Curated annotation (Swiss-Prot):
It comes from the Bacteria. Probably facilitates nickel incorporation. May constitute a multicomponent high-affinity nickel transporter. Not essential for the expression of catalytically active urease. Belongs to the NiCoT transporter (TC 2.A.52) family. The chain crosses the membrane at residues 48-68, 79-99, 130-150, 162-182, 196-216. Its main location: membrane. Keywords: Cell membrane, Membrane, Nickel, Transmembrane, Transmembrane helix, Transport. The keyword Cytoplasm does not apply. The gene is ureH. It comes from Bacillus sp. (strain TB-90). This is Urease accessory protein UreH. InterPro entries: Chloro_ReproSupport/MetalTrans, UreH-like_TM_dom. GO terms for cellular component: plasma membrane. It is a multi-pass membrane protein.
Length: 228
């Protein structure tokens, strides 16, 4: 493969990475994290950390499978996808329940009669972003290997392809979390509107997660693979 062809393939990988970051299960999962942020830069970094987790996992597992010339079974691949559905439901419910905790903290603050603010936002949830990025990376490893092997010929070319693809996912999710973070940031001082956004995001994540698991388990036959 000459340099021009390789550059074209790497560019395509970068563009596909941006597109890949915009898949529904990706953006919905990260939205449940972004919706609880009140600073735009924190929203942006949530996307970056998702991309880091996603890319590092694809790189490690993808290259391991390519070098060992192995394949991930359909059952394992679908099971990892099913795990994504579980996390979507968990993150969705957690986002909704976070409103209850915020209300309880606000209520406690009124009874303390203190001028010192009580921060209900504990830490920056970069670990959550990194975690869901890793899970998404694991779930997408099988497809990534197939895409890489059908695109390039050598292992080092595969490494470059995954890196460019990963860079695209980081940029794609960074762009998305920055854009989606704007309404959450602007509504941070308007409690009712901000909480409504969180409730809607949590509800969408929960419903989509249930649909995602049902589709994998029933429609695509994962449950049958488990019990065969």
């Amino acid at each position: 493969m000459d340099q021009v062809d390789l550059l074209s393939i790497l560019t395509l990988g970068f563009v596909l990475g941006i597109k890949h970051a915009m898949e529904p299960d990706h953006v919905i999962a990260v939205s449940t994290i972004v919706c609880q942020s009140k600073k735009l830069w924190r929203s942006s970094l949530a996307g970056v950390f998702w991309g880091i987790g996603h890319t590092s996992t694809l790189l490690i597992f993808g290259m391991t499978i390519i070098l060992m010339k192995k394949k991930i079974s359909q059952e394992w691949s679908m099971s990892l996808e099913f795990l994504v559905g579980i996390i979507l439901v968990y993150f969705g419910i957690s986002a909704i329940l976070s409103l209850k905790k915020t209300h309880e903290h606000s209520h406690s603050r009124l009874h303390l009669h203190t001028d010192h603010p009580i921060y209900t936002y504990k830490g920056i949830p970069y670990v959550k972003s990194l975690f869901i990025g890793i899970i998404h990376g694991l779930a997408g490893s099988a497809a990534m290997v197939l895409l890489t092997m059908s695109t390039v010929e050598k292992a080092w070319e595969g490494l470059l392809y995954i890196l460019f693809f990963g860079a695209g996912t980081v940029l794609g999710m960074l762009s998305f979390t920055t854009l989606i973070g704007i309404p959450f940031t602007l509504s941070a001082r308007k409690i009712r509107i901000h909480n409504a956004f969180i409730q809607i995001t949590g509800f969408i994540s929960t419903v989509f997660g249930i649909h995602y698991m049902y589709n994998l388990g029933v429609t695509e036959g994962l449950f049958k693979l488990w019990i065969r």
